[in-house]
Amino acid sequence: MYVFNFYPIPRKSINFRSDVDDLGFLRPWSPQEESGCKKQYEAWYSSYLPIVVRRRCRWEKENPRRNSHLLQRFVRKGIPHTFRKELWLRSCPSRADGVWQRHEVPDEVIKQIKLDLPRTFPDNKFLKTEGTRKTLGRALFAVAEHIPSVGYCQGLNFVAGVILLVVNDESRAIDLLVHLVSQRQEYYGKNMIGLRRDMHVLHSLLREHCPRVVVTLEKLDVGLDMLVGKWFVCWFVESLPMETVLRLWDCLIYEGDEWLFRIAVALFRSNMIAISSCESIDQLMTEVQNIGTSKAALYCHQLILKSAALSITNKSIEALRADAELAIPE
């Protein structure tokens, strides 16, 4: 899986000879990447560059922060890297304000965190240093300390890594991590009740927006938690290209959970023919895994626009969640 990123900076300032991008991830033209990935990236890059340069000019010219509806539209069309930290932290409280209490962290949780530190984006230029890994460990410890019902769950290490790389401020990055995980804490913990509930919700949405996929799921008797549970646990990190993840998170942080469902449904719709043609569980799992490297996943601007057009809102999600809670066992 490629996790390359792209930032809207002037063409002349891009170092094409560098093997890593601004977040420290390997570029597709690195010798360690496959040539097919490089060609796919270059085609996307040439179409995406004018979009992000244009969006940055619009952000600098119009200042969308002055109007919530205008800001929503601008966020959906992409937050320039220079403004991303500011927008992500816009509504994030500080731990210094006493919003979260501290709890004792079990030794077993600390052990699990330590085991996953070197496994977190091991090829990333910045996260593989000892100092940054310690920072990552402190961030994950803070989640366990402030949200004991979560403790630590595999996948949160990747979420924390992305936040640290983007925010580039340990204290505020930890604030944001704890804040975002607290909003989705039922995805984690022993019974993962929130994840099971939202897989039920996603199934209902797929039945409405791409019923052919649901027919295949039911024919093969496969649950969405096995297929795409990781999407929701990791908020699509390690499942989609990094620029796509960042664009999704822009919307997720500003608008809420509806964007997890919007993206999931849009990805299934874009790959509906291949998925609905599957005749076995193994074939289905392969097709779902291939979604992350599909053209639909790479062309993030088009994916966001298609997702925004879906009739999925936080209000409709809450209604479906209420129904799902009655249907799933405790």
UniProtKB/Swiss-Prot annotation:
**In the record, what terms sit under GO molecular function?**
GTPase activator activity
Kindly give the Gene3D superfamilies that the UniProt entry links to this protein. putative rabgap domain of human tbc1 domain family member 14 like domains, Ypt/Rab-GAP domain of gyp1p, domain 1, Ypt/Rab-GAP domain of gyp1p, domain 3
InterPro entries xref list: Rab-GAP-TBC_dom, Rab-GAP_TBC_sf, Rab_GAP_TBC_domain
Q: Where does the source fall among the domains of life?
A: Eukaryota
Every copy of the Rab-GAP TBC domain together lies at 78-256
> What name does the UniProt record give this protein?
Growth hormone-regulated TBC protein 6
Q: Which species does this protein come from?
A: Caenorhabditis elegans
* Gene that produces this protein: tbc-6
